[in-house]
């Protein structure tokens, strides 16, 4: 038994302050405490609702986007079905919900669902491409504040936007980002490197850093589920390109990466030959879930296991994916590995390189390479 574990949220906040010697925003830190407890107890406190696969952009690398013709006669879930699922999720413990798509703001009854979640007392985050964040939408969000507006930036000019998304939408998005900032709404900008964006990713990141203190750079692409042929491996940059991107961002933030010869770094892999305790190391299926536009529950957007809350009810569907998540096999070689603290432990990322429970050799090599380039700081190997 770990006697150092805080017994309540107040002790948790005190622990964070002692460790970091600074004050914390109470809700953010309290959310972290709830997250740690929820994972242990299997409570679904986070829910992501993929309202629609339809979008007003046509990004070549998007994992979910479909056109109206590609729906092939299938229809979007009506608002009442979504509300029923959301209420069941709330009853099961959800207090934070993310609305996404496609482009979630194109869903005809977006406002109805957003306000319904607010009425339940949920924090609501919105993932959007930013095109529809006009003055009217900003007034709506000021009246009913979201927990976060996350906007993906696909370029730094109309020419780049057209190449990546099929639409010259940069100036619209840029103006709308400024609207969000002026309104004082919480903002996160994301950038997704890909070979359609190419070298323009650097100016895109520079622009993102000038617009927001909070940006996220994705480091892999999702394979489209409906049309896996639409993206091939060449669309996802190689490790060397990601290293250039992440070093560039470090330098923008005043961080000087410390490179080391790769042969001075330890080989990946720990001493264990028996499998460690199973279970996903993220919150997917343990404290969070995704419900797709088809009404299927998933561990996350990138993993295949699914259940059917429309047929079986939310509680039974959650039980199914939670069982999968807590019994997910982990590679024995990861336990005690020198890179254990810095490795990307995303199970979906592991699945790109190996079957569940096996060591993902190519990912291990990539992690070692990133450490040699100074992107990852390996404990015990700092200069």
Where is each model-derived feature located?
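N-terminal pre-core extensions flanking Radical SAM catalytic domains
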Residues: 1-70, 87-90, 268, 379-382
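Local cysteine-cluster metal-coordination motifs and their immediate loop/turn environment
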Residues: 54-65, 332-349
